[in-house]
A protein has these predicted regions:
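Glycine-rich phosphate-binding loop plus the immediately following alpha-helix
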Residues: 147-188, 274-278, 284-288, 376-385, ...
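Glycine-rich phosphate-binding loops at beta-strand->alpha-helix junctions
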Residues: 62-63, 234-263, 274-278, 410-413, ...
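Adenine-nucleotide phosphate-binding core of ATP-dependent small-molecule kinases
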Residues: 200-231, 519-548
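Short glycine-rich, Thr/Ser-proximal phosphate-binding strand/loop in the N-terminal lobe
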Residues: 4-39, 43, 150-151, 155, ...
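Conserved phosphate-binding catalytic cores of ATP/NTP-utilizing and phosphoryl-transfer enzymes
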Residues: 64-99, 104-150, 230, 234-235, ...
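An N-terminal assembly and electron-transfer interface module characteristic of large anaerobic redox
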Residues: 3, 154, 159-164, 475-482, ...
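Glycine-rich phosphate-binding/hydrolytic loop that grips phosphoryl groups
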Residues: 84-87, 162-170, 272-305, 435, ...
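Acidic, glycine/GT-rich loop-and beta-edge segments that sit at the periphery of enzyme/chaperone cores
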Residues: 141, 288-348, 456, 607-680
């Protein structure tokens, strides 16, 4: 019998399908190839050859082209393969669950013994699919099948695909098949970034550390995948009709397809053999009649030439590696066995340091001299509290006489661990790492720490932290990526390290974000690159990411002479060697490189409790009795004390301590500070004032005009309208319109417009506009929306020109195209040119058939400008008042700069409240005197000119420091961030940048801000 054979070689798996003459599946096979594509192909073809000697063959899949070229076999692009399968097979919608165990290579046998369900069910209703949604290991697609084929595919980012689910399962410490089981038990959905899988991971990790339930996290992960697919791929086209779900994640995780159904408000289905549609399409397209055993021999004989750029091997030979190991064994923390220490009754007191990190938890004990007595390094597996509890229980069991006289926590879980176990204090992790490095190398002048999700670089000057570099919201380029890739290879990190060390020609993957290197990795796989060379290339890339993307150095050798590298990632000899080769110098790696945060915390506990008498009568902070009585419980709350409506997890411990997470301010915790001081800090927050000042324009019973002659007209409260609302509201009200302003954004606003977003790369504030339009049309039933295009902003004479950025200026046109059934007024106007402005508006209002005349428009323009100038004057006056009052009360001031629309709570994620809650006054760029300054870039954008002006103002005020909010995806901020940094650094001021996007958890933001404050306070210096 002549059969049709299709191979689908994807990013993580290989699949094979054999069809009979009637296109029925008579054989199928599936397993992970672990990047060994040729070996996997030989394996799977051998199994086929056992049953079928010849057949028509074609190959598809993201990693299949190299093999197709080797065999001179037809390659079918996977989209067309999927389309051919959809067209060539009859699809029946049934309740049958087609389950496949991905961990087994032997597939279930049909009665005919051919390896498949020969008698496929055709019960149920036959359907014609309208849309196919396919999720693979690192690929995602939506095929719109009606009205001609339209395909949407993910780019190089693997966010929202099977590999992301793999990462999340690993992060939660569960098997991937448990995701579905846990998701079905969920009671709460956490808002998680949907733009990118790594961003979602950055949201999830702090939730894991803060004790969120795994069941809720599991479903939240699936929701994030749905959001990524709809927002990132559909890009404004509505998903409707008969939906077919394809690919591994949608096959193996029924809860994922259920989440799609929930969000799309429809009922899709997973067809039989959904996992094999690409392979089936390839089989249908097969044109080469082949002998299978000939193909196997051809693969064995073919060697792939190196077609990629290579780097120097990490180690030329065993001798070089031995010298490397010997050199790095010289710098050590002094150690002593804990049992030996406790055998001397004079040495009962120890100090505990806990580093509750993003993926691991580290604990150390030291004596009063800083000698390391005990250590533990382990994955936190989603429960840091239980990890610490188990460590302490085992400690007391092994050493009943031990007394813990002081304790300190650091890392993501700093506050959680400190409260759970009555520790004396917490310390921001950057400061903890500095303390530890200084203990080993007193003259240290630069520290590089690469952990699971965080990258910290500290510049040390005169014995104190002088500058801080942290990776942004994205955790790519850190240890977690290497860990994930090792998992994909089926090896642990020790084996991964060995593979990289034995590389002879590491592949050059550049210094891009490592998630975006997937395309390069796939290409290397197609070319037959060895796993060793890919592993070594990734080690180089992590190093380059630190040097050129985080530190942003142009000369690696200029960082310093006494460099300490630390963090779990540097436990890898391969990463360390790549760093030394790239730097062209030798560095110091402590023998406890992965424990430096915990060790620094223990040193700080020692300093914090320095007045304790070290004798046998000293009172420990934790006892064995305390641990026996230890318990905690958690509950989910929604805080309604401000517009953020934070989703709170409240954890109460047996020691009467409570821990709140998810809150962006201290309002929910009335006991945190006294009410008078809290009220003062609220008054010293310009962002609170901005929202209150603009609230007078919100649409409500008091602020409506139902008898307006010209009816309702809507304004979206976002982008170019945010600061201009006083003008437009007054202007249109004066023309006798009932002006409806959409409310302040929240998560629901984003979800309302999510399906209309045409690009996943546009900034988050622009994405929110779609939701504001839906609110105006669906909730307020506004018949007309006024959303003008403003090429120019108000001219404040502080720049060479006064443009708005292209998104701010012209997004109204995108909105109009996305909402063809709504009536939009989108005039191109210049608020600086009254004559042309009024004439243009007159022509625009003619579309509404009003009798508004030009003189009325001119009067309304004057009234609007008066209103706008009053608002801007009020902001400046309030800013001056905040600065004056903060100085009177000796409160530090933060200049939190960005764009006017960064005042939106859903955009800034509560960062102003967070800074205020840390005891600082908050002002913004609108609060400072306007002044044109010299810049190193073309200064032609109004919003950006204000940033430069604010930075210059900060350089002239010692008690004010700047923090810049940047929306991810903002192209112009690639320029402004460098210029703002340059202005500040000329005056020896620290620059702090906060990347904000759909991310909702502020754990990383809090660490960055506290690091700034620690450096400013001189909290950690050589004198400590």
């Amino acid at each position: 019998m002549t059969v049709k054979i299709g191979l689908d070689i994807g990013s993580t798996t290989i699949k094979a399908v054999v069809l009979d003459i009637e296109n029925r599946v008579i054989f199928k096979e599936y397993f992970r190839h672990l990047s060994k594509i040729n070996e996997a192909a030989i394996d799977i073809l051998s199994r086929i050859c056992d049953r079928f000697k010849v057949g028509f063959l074609a190959i598809s899949g993201s990693a299949g082209m190299g093999l197709a070229n080797t065999l001179n076999i037809k390659f079918v692009q996977e989209v067309f393969a999927t389309k051919m399968a959809l067209d060539g097979l009859d699809l029946y919608k049934t309740d049958k669950k087609n389950k496949v165990d991905e961990n087994k290579n032997d597939m279930p046998k049909c009665d005919g013994g051919c390896g498949c369900d020969h008698n496929q069910s055709d019960s149920g209703s036959k359907i014609e699919p309208d849309v196919a949604i396919e999720l693979g290991g690192e690929d995602a697609k939506i095929l719109f099948l009606k009205g001609g084929l339209e395909v949407r595919m993910n780019g190089t980012c693997a966010g929202g695909t099977g590999s992301f689910i793999d990462q999340m399962a690993s992060l939660l410490g569960i098997d991937i098949d448990k995701i579905d089981e846990y998701a079905k038990q969920a009671q709460k959905i956490y808002p998680i970034a949907s733009r990118c899988g790594v961003f979602a991971k950055t949201d999830i990790q702090p939730l894991v550390n803060q004790g969120a339930k795994i069941q809720d996290l599991a479903k939240s992960i699936l929701y994030a995948i749905v959001d990524q697919t709809i927002g990132g791929l559909a890009q404004g086209r509505k998903i409707e009709g008969n939906i077919v779900y394809l690919g591994g994640p949608l096959t193996f995780i029924p809860s994922l397809s259920a989440c799609f159904d929930e969000i799309l408000s429809l009922k899709g289905f997973v067809p039989d053999n959904s996992l094999y549609f690409v392979a089936t399409g390839a089989a249908l397209a097969g044109q080469n009649l082949c002998k299978i055993d000939d193909l196997i021999e051809k693969i064995k004989e073919k060697s792939n030439p190196v077609t990629y750029n290579t780097l120097a091997p990490l180690f030329k030979n065993e001798t070089e590696y031995a010298d490397f190991k010997q050199r790095h064994e010289k710098k050590h923390i002094q150690m002593q066995d804990l049992g030996e220490f406790l055998s001397d009754r004079r040495n009962q007191g120890v100090f505990l340091g806990v580093d509750s990190g993003s993926t691991t938890i580290k604990m150390v004990l030291i004596d009063k001299n800083g000698t390391l007595l005990h250590q533990q390094y382990s994955l936190n597996k989603g429960n840091p509290v239980d990890n610490v509890k188990n460590y302490l229980e085992n400690l007391f069991l092994s050493h009943p006489s031990i007394k813990i006289l002081g304790g300190c926590a650091t890392g993501y879980g700093e506050e959680l661990i400190a409260k759970a176990f009555n520790l004396n204090c917490g310390i921001v992790e950057t400061a903890a790492h500095f303390l530890a490095a200084k203990q080993i190398l007193p003259d240290v002048d630069f520290i590089v720490d690469i952990g699971g999700q965080d990258m910290k670089c500290l510049k040390i000057k005169n014995g104190a932290i002088d500058d801080i570099f942290l990776n942004e919201a994205c955790s790519s380029g850190c240890g977690s990526f290497l860990q994930t890739f090792a998992f994909a290879l089926g090896v642990d990190m020790h084996k991964f390290n060995d593979l990289a060390q034995n590389s002879d020609a590491p592949v050059d993957l550049g210094s891009r974000c490592t998630v975006f290197m997937n395309s390069s990795i796939k290409q290397a796989q197609k070319d037959g690159t060895s796993v060793q060379n890919i592993a070594a290339g990734l080690c180089y890339s992590v190093v380059k990411n630190a040097l050129y993307k985080v530190i942003r150095t142009t000369d690696a050798g200029a960082l310093g002479k006494n460099i300490v590298v630390q963090g779990g990632t540097f436990l890898s000899d391969a990463v360390l060697r790549a760093f030394e080769i790239e730097m062209n110098l030798t560095v110091t790696r402590p023998n406890i490189a992965g424990l430096m945060g915990a060790y620094g915390a223990a040193l700080y506990a020692l300093k914090y409790t320095k007045n304790i008498s070290f004798d046998t009568d000293s009172i420990p902070i934790i006892t064995q009795i305390d641990l026996k009585k230890f318990f905690y419980n958690s509950q989910n709350l929604t805080c309604g004390k401000c517009p953020n409506k934070c989703q709170i997890v409240k954890i109460e411990f047996s020691n009467n301590q409570k821990y709140l997470t998810g809150n962006k301010c201290s309002l929910i915790d009335e006991g945190q500070t006294d009410k008078a001081h809290k009220q003062l800090l609220k008054e010293l927050n310009i962002f609170e004032y901005k929202l209150n000042r603009l609230s007078k324009y919100f649409y409500n019973q008091k602020n409506s005009n139902p008898n307006a002659k010209n009816g309702k007209i809507g304004l979206p409260f976002q982008l170019n309208m945010y600061e201009m609302i006083p003008f437009w509201h007054k202007f249109l009200s004066a023309l006798d319109f009932d002006v409806v302003l959409s409310p302040v954004s929240d998560l629901a606003t984003f979800r309302k417009g999510q399906a209309d977003i045409p690009s996943d790369t546009v900034c988050f504030p622009a994405k929110l506009v779609h939701g504001h339009i839906k609110t105006l049309t669906d909730q307020f039933k506004v018949p007309v929306i006024f959303y003008p295009c403003l090429s120019y902003n108000i001219n404040q004479d502080i720049s060479n020109n006064h443009f708005n950025c292209p998104v701010v200026a012209y997004y109204p046109q995108v909105i109009g195209i996305s909402n063809p059934n709504a009536l939009f007024l989108q005039p191109f106007v210049d608020p600086n040119d009254k004559k042309s402005f009024c004439k243009t508006i007159e022509g625009e209002l003619f579309k509404l058939k009003t009798d508004i005349k030009l003189p009325q428009i001119k009067r309304a323009f004057d009234l609007g400008m008066e209103e706008l100038n009053g608002y801007l004057s009020d902001l400046k006056q309030k800013g001056e008042e905040i600065i004056k009052k903060a100085r009177q009360n000796k409160i530090d001031i933060v200049m939190l700069v960005g764009r006017p629309y960064h005042a939106d709570p859903e955009v800034n994620k509560g960062i102003p409240k967070l800074i205020s809650g840390l005891g600082k006054a908050v002002v913004s760029e609108e609060c400072v005197p306007l002044k044109k300054i010299e810049t190193g870039v073309l200064n032609q954008w109004t919003y950006h000119a204000r940033l430069y002006n604010a930075a210059d103002f900060v350089t002239r005020n010692d008690d004010i420091n700047l923090v810049q909010m940047v929306s991810f995806g903002c192209g112009l901020d690639a320029v402004t961030t460098d210029e703002v940094r340059a202005i500040l650094e000329k005056s020896k001021k620290l620059y702090t940048q906060l990347k904000i996007d759909e991310i909702t958890n502020l754990g990383a933001v809090k660490i960055r801000i506290k690091s700034l404050f620690a450096a400013l306070d001189g909290k950690i210096t050589a004198a400590d």
